[in-house]
Structure formats: C-alpha cells, structure tokens
Amino acid sequence: MAMFYAHALGGYDENLHAFPGISSTVANDVRKYSVVSVYNNKYDIVKDKYMWCYSQVNKRYIGALLPMFECNEYLQIGDPIHDQEGNQISIITYRHKNYYALSGIGYESLDLCLEGVGIHHHVLETGNAVYGKVQHDYSTIKEKAKEMNALSPGPIIDYHVWIGDCICQVTAVDVHGKEIMRMRFKKGAVLPIPNLVKVKLGENDTENLSSTISAAPSR
C-alpha cells in the first residue's frame, strides 16, 4: 500500500522518495492524470498551466512544476488524492486560490543543497525581463547585463526562481549580483499562496510549515 507523508506536518524522510511537499513509498508520475478525485469528488487537471511548488527540508530544496486541479472546496493538507480507479496517488499539499497541486514526478524540477546558498521566489510580471536577481523592462535589463558583464564571476550565493504566466526561469548570482547561471522553462505557472491550506493540530502536535512561501512581485 502506497504511503504519503506531508513535509508541512514533519513528514520528510530521506529514505523515501521526495517530491515538493511530500515523502512517499512510491514514485508516481503525476503528469499522466487528467482527472483526480478527493473524497469521491472528481476534478479535472488544468491544461497548460502549472504550479511551482517546493519544500526546504534539512538544507535541501526540492522544487518542481506540478500539475494542478481546480476545486472550490476546502481541502486539508494530507487529504488523500486518488485516480479514477480508486488508487491513492498523492495527498493535498499546496494551493493557489482555488487550485491545488498534484505532487509526485512532475515536469521541470530543481533539487539543490542549500548549504551556504539562499533561494528566493518571485512572480515574473508580464512584459518584464530578468537579469540575476532583478526584473524590469527589457531595455533596463539589457543595460544592467552590459554593466555586470564587466565584472569577473564569483561563487554562487543565491538562486532566484521567477514564475510567470508564459515562462519560468531560474537564475543564480554571485555576491555582486552578477548572473552566473540561467535556466528557462517554457511553461506558465503560479506560486502557492502560503497558509491558505490550514493544518488542524492536536495539543501535543508541533507545527512545521517550512514548505510555505511568501511570493511577491520584485523589481
């Protein structure tokens, strides 16, 4: 029987498969599902739109673009998600408004050791370009890149994840803000909104919500 443990409830286990928000005894490819169910209610997977989700546990970053489904009901972290045959395939983890992520083997992913480095998340505003740790209109960013190109590169100290309606990017910068690395994912996505999926705790439970994030536009 497949077992799933929510990172937000302290369920990270380095001996199990790890995906954003969960550790599990199985590695489910969640890209293959078009319909899922929660407590016998069926929900369609959203087409061509994804949610960038991540956990930060034991100085490890586990992030990925995940499928999501629309649901107007209130779902708890840890609620089971099943396929159409009744097999459990995941649990509730992250939410953005009325959309819930389906965690497992997703699309583009990022697994990092955070020893000595930071990672930051940003909403990429429509029409903006990115250089390193800043976003702005294209002409401003072009000038910024020219300015920074004169500097010698140093060790990476921070990663920046940029989530936009049409494209997602990951950049890495040194101490001067010089861009050292960039990845582009040609998919539109959203970031989870923290604390909208509430956790009911017993009096002897401890709360571990290290997987929640604060996503705000940055300039």
Swiss-Prot record:
The substrate binding site is formed by the N-terminus of a monomer and the C-terminus of the opposite monomer. Keywords: Early protein, Hydrolase, Nuclease. The keyword RNA-binding does not apply. One of its GO terms (biological process) is symbiont-mediated suppression of host innate immune response. This is Poxin. Its EC number is 3.1.-.-. The gene is OPG188. GO terms for cellular component: host cell cytoplasm. The keyword Nuclease applies. Nuclease that is responsible for viral evasion of host cGAS-STING innate immunity. Cleaves 2',3'-cGAMP which is produced by host cGAS following recognition of cytosolic DNA and blocks the subsequent 2',3'-cGAMP-mediated activation of TMEM173/STING, which normally spreads to adjacent cells and activates the interferon and NF-kappa-B immune responses. Homodimer. It catalyses: 2',3'-cGAMP + H2O = Gp(2'-5')Ap(3') + H(+). Disruption phenotype: Knockout induces a 40 fold decreased replication of the virus. It comes from Vaccinia virus (strain Western Reserve) (VACV). The record marks 60, 105, 149, 169, 182, 184, 186 as: Substrate binding. It comes from the Viruses. Changing residue 182 to A: Stalls the 2',3'-cGAMP cleavage reaction at an intermediary stage. It holds the Pfam family Baculo_p26.
